[in-house]
Amino acid sequence: MAKKVQAYVKLQVAAGMANPSPPVGPALGQQGVNIMEFCKAFNAKTESLEKGLPTPVVITVYADRSFTFITKTPPAAVLLKKAAGIKSGSGKPNKDKVGKISRTQLQEIAQTKAADMTGSDIEAMTRSIEGTARSMGLVVED
C-alpha cells in the first residue's frame, strides 16, 4: 500500500548550498522531516548544476516523516539574467532597456526549461521565454 502523504512543500533553494537555515529549516521542521538528511540528498542531486543557482524543489512529506523530492529547472528569469549578463531586470521594461539577448540564447533556455514547461513545441516555448525577456527589459535580437 502507498504511503499517506502528509504535505507538499515547495521551496527555491540554491543548488548545492542547502543548509538548515531559513527557508529550508523552518519549512521542513514544521513537517517533522530530518532537515540534514534532506540537505545532504539535495546537495548531492544538484551537484551537476552551477553552485548557487536558485533551484525550485517540491518535497513530498509522508505521514511516517519520510520524504521524496523533485528538483525543477531554475526559473526563466534567472537563466535570462545569466545569459544577458545583468544583475536585475528593468523596473520600467517599456522605457528602460537593460540588455540584449539573441534568439539562439532564447532557444537554449527554452530547451533547458522544456521538461518543466507546458507547450507543444520548442517554438511555442521560445516565444514564452521571449515574453519573459521583454517583461524584464531585455531587447530580443534575431
UniProtKB/Swiss-Prot annotation:
One of its GO terms (cellular component) is cytosolic large ribosomal subunit. Keywords: Methylation, Ribonucleoprotein, Ribosomal protein, RNA-binding, rRNA-binding. GO terms for molecular function: large ribosomal subunit rRNA binding; structural constituent of ribosome. InterPro entries: Ribosomal_uL11, Ribosomal_uL11_bac-typ, Ribosomal_uL11_C, Ribosomal_uL11_C_sf, Ribosomal_uL11_CS, Ribosomal_uL11_N, Ribosomal_uL11_N_sf. Part of the ribosomal stalk of the 50S ribosomal subunit. Interacts with L10 and the large rRNA to form the base of the stalk. L10 forms an elongated spine to which L12 dimers bind in a sequential fashion forming a multimeric L10(L12)X complex. HAMAP family: Ribosomal_uL11. This is Large ribosomal subunit protein uL11.
